[in-house]
Amino acid sequence: ACAMPYTYGSNDGNSTSDIENSKLVVMFGNNPAETRMSGGGITWYLEQARERSNARMIVIVPRYTDTAAGREDEWIPIRPGTDAALVAGIAWVLINEDLVDQPFLDKYCVGYDEKTLPAGAPANGHYKAYILGEGDDGIAKTPQWASRITGIPTDRIIKLAREIGMSKPAYICQGWGPQRQANGELTARAIAMLPILTGNVGINGGNSGARESTYTITIERLPVLENPVKTAISCFTWTDAIARGPEMTASRDGVRGKEKLDVPIKFIWNYAGNTITNQHSDINKT
């Protein structure tokens, strides 16, 4: 969720009910039937919308989930933490088979190719060069390359890319599982590149690649008081703050409000969150 504003400026995406206008639904690590209060009504809206559109649904997730549960047209199991590599392999096919929405990329996007590369950016520092192996790492992100990382057969990656490139509107979304790892925010942003490449952003039946939007109920909350302590760290680094707090700095560890921590964490008050255990990117460490 925190990665989307760095791509779009907000977390917004199309609602589940808009799938009634879609031809294809692709879910990356998304399991609303189990993670949103046992579905929270989303599963019902999903089924109703698909019944109206007859959209094909592909679920990409390591284990078979309740969201799939016979509703999916295809389940593609993937090695955990490798969604970004899959996206790169798909992007390679989209680019090489001319399945990208070039007018959309030229008009609305920055940094896809040399035409929209910002002034001062390094040569071949654009997304297209990265995918084709013309960037700094020199590695072409071919389906064969992606297959070795993800465990998904090469021909299935190619087929998936063509399905995404040829089915418009396509509703591409993700859950929060893919980014529950080190540098996971980049995985979330990678998934968002698929609707960008294919011009499925901002249209009926499309999506931004974010988690599906749904109906909300306004609830009363306690007022938020001003915190006199201005120093803060990422919630994922609480383990480091216990083990080596005084060594953590702003430049290396993302400490905010101070150049470095003065003391390690000695007490944790955890409320309405589970970053202490199973929502952390390194549960072996927690």
Cite the ranges covered by each PLM segment.
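Active-site-proximal structural scaffolding
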Residues: 18-19, 39, 50, 68, ...
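Extended redox/cofactor-interaction regions of prokaryotic respiratory oxidoreductases
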Residues: 1-55, 59-60, 85, 148, ...
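Active-site phosphate/pyrophosphate-binding segments
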Residues: 115-116, 121-247
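Short helix-capping/linker segments at secondary-structure and domain boundaries
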Residues: 94-102, 182, 198-205, 279
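Long, well-ordered, tryptophan-enriched scaffold segments
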Residues: 56-58, 63-167
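Generic structural "secondary-structure junction" signal
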Residues: 6, 10, 21, 78-80, ...
